[in-house]
Amino acid sequence: MTKRALVSVSNKTGLIPFVKGLAEAGVEILSTGGGTKRALEEAGIAVVNVSDVTGFPEILDGRVKTLHPNIHGGLLAMRTNDEHIKQIEELGIEPIDYVVVNLYPFAETIANPDASFADAIENIDIGGPSMLRSAAKNHADVTVVVDPADYDAVLASLDASKEEQLALRQKLAAKVFRHTAAYDAMIGSYLTDAVGEENPESLTVTYTHKQTLRYGENPHQKAAFYESRTSSPSSIAQAKQLHGKELSYNNINDANAALEIVKEFSEPAAVAVKHMNPCGVGTGATVGEAYTRAYEADPKSIFGGIVALNREVDRATAEKMAAIFLEVILAPSFSEEAKAILQQKKNIRLLEVAVTKGELEKKLASVHGGLLIQEEDHLGFDDGDIRIPTKREPTEEEWTALKLGWKVVKHVKSNAIVLTNGEMTVGIGAGQMNRVGAAAIAIEQAGERAQGAALASDAFFPYGDTVEAAAKAGITAIIQPGGSVRDNESIEKADEYGIAMVFTGVRHFKH
């Protein structure tokens, strides 16, 4: 009996040589009456219209083409089941042995900011997933292909043993169910967002494999990198690597942290990160000036770190960065001179990525047996309920330093204290179990630079001891959420030492 293949694709990459290979092997080609059929016929391939198989025309602007027993009976009939064969023969249904289908471009449609809700709905494929699932269910007899990357393997299997062919069909069927599940999850997520349902009764997220990593945080841990189907151009997932070795698990985490911090700034800025915490942040009139300040913030910790910048890297800045060992540099662009300088260092990774704030994403965190989901911490200085509870108000210079510290401290692991002047961080205390301990670390790191600096705290002071430590170090201004039952202690201490203190009403815990 002549084998038959039903072909209907939106992605025509590699299609013609693949279908020619099937046809040369004696496979009869069926297709719907759209672009796929035209492309095949223009390539000289004989094609049978699906309407001739079903005896029914395409209707409803093409919404119904293949939803017919002559198609699904041919896909689902088990070749080893005599009753199945008898039934399809009595009904004049012929088996279909290959299904080559990929789906309407729903992801691409919703990624287009100009696409309407109606456009999205029209790009929900119905017939395609139905054929894929029928074929995948009956993979004992049917070869189903959803990915052009598998075309060569299918052609090669034509001369393989039955066992090898079955193994390939099983592999392809598993891919199909993953693919259709991801497709449906994406549609479900889009419609859920459209109706504003915040916590649906079930949550399905879908990502595509981007990279198998050498290992995870440590060499004994296996790891991989997956990309959201709706990732932003301003994301590590869409960063373009211009130079260097493959990114590691830790590189990706740290680069993501650096990118999210540098997005906080509209002026030229540079951020150095180690272990997902900033070790130095600088701003300036130029990106070179900003990098110099980020480096000077902590020249020891930046070694082997990740640096993110929000302006093009020029020759002068590249020369400065080339003077030390850095794992990753990411920026919106690199001048040709800068690339030539940095590419001389074989171990450095250069990433080109848009540095703009995009749409807010949900933050996911896995716990054993479950998943936590929350909104991004997107609130900035202007989003708070700003008030000054102390007798003295900040000077203009102090306001500049306080705002810089507030931008940075939300990205530091709690308990977090950040000391700044108006141009750079001078001390960072991260991840401490008590706030006064975090302040002590930041103050020690700052040394003499604590004199006249501003202090930012991610959460309120439970006692007045942190204010007292700040005063003794010469800090003149503080920004914190406020809200402690003992706020009066901190306010009294600040007034005692002439410190200007700002309450924002916004907490920035980070775990």
UniProtKB/Swiss-Prot annotation:
Pfam families the UniProt entry points to: AICARFT_IMPCHas (PF01808), MGS (PF02142)
Catalysed reactions, as listed in the record: (6R)-10-formyltetrahydrofolate + 5-amino-1-(5-phospho-beta-D-ribosyl)imidazole-4-carboxamide = 5-formamido-1-(5-phospho-D-ribosyl)imidazole-4-carboxamide + (6S)-5,6,7,8-tetrahydrofolate; IMP + H2O = 5-formamido-1-(5-phospho-D-ribosyl)imidazole-4-carboxamide
EC number of the protein: 2.1.2.3, 3.5.4.10
PROSITE patterns (alphabetical): MGS
Family matches, as InterPro entries: AICAR_Tfase_dup_dom_sf (IPR024051), Cytidine_deaminase-like (IPR016193), MGS-like_dom (IPR011607), MGS-like_dom_sf (IPR036914), PurH-like (IPR002695)
A biological-process GO annotation: 'de novo' IMP biosynthetic process
Keywords: Hydrolase, Multifunctional enzyme, Purine biosynthesis, Transferase
Entries under Gene3D superfamilies matching the protein: 3.40.140.20, Methylglyoxal synthase-like domain
One example GO MF annotation: IMP cyclohydrolase activity
Gene Ontology CC terms, in alphabetical order: cytosol
Location of the MGS-like domain: 1-146
Domain of life of the native organism: Bacteria
Pathway: Purine metabolism; IMP biosynthesis via de novo pathway; 5-formamido-1-(5-phospho-D-ribosyl)imidazole-4-carboxamide from 5-amino-1-(5-phospho-D-ribosyl)imidazole-4-carboxamide (10-formyl THF route): step 1/1; Purine metabolism; IMP biosynthesis via de novo pathway; IMP from 5-formamido-1-(5-phospho-D-ribosyl)imidazole-4-carboxamide: step 1/1
NCBIfam families with a match to the protein in the record: PRK00881.1, purH
Domain comment (free text): The IMP cyclohydrolase activity resides in the N-terminal region.
Family: Belongs to the PurH family.
Name used for this protein in its record: Bifunctional purine biosynthesis protein PurH
Source taxonomy: Bacteria, Bacillati, Bacillota, Bacilli, Bacillales
Name of the encoding gene: purH
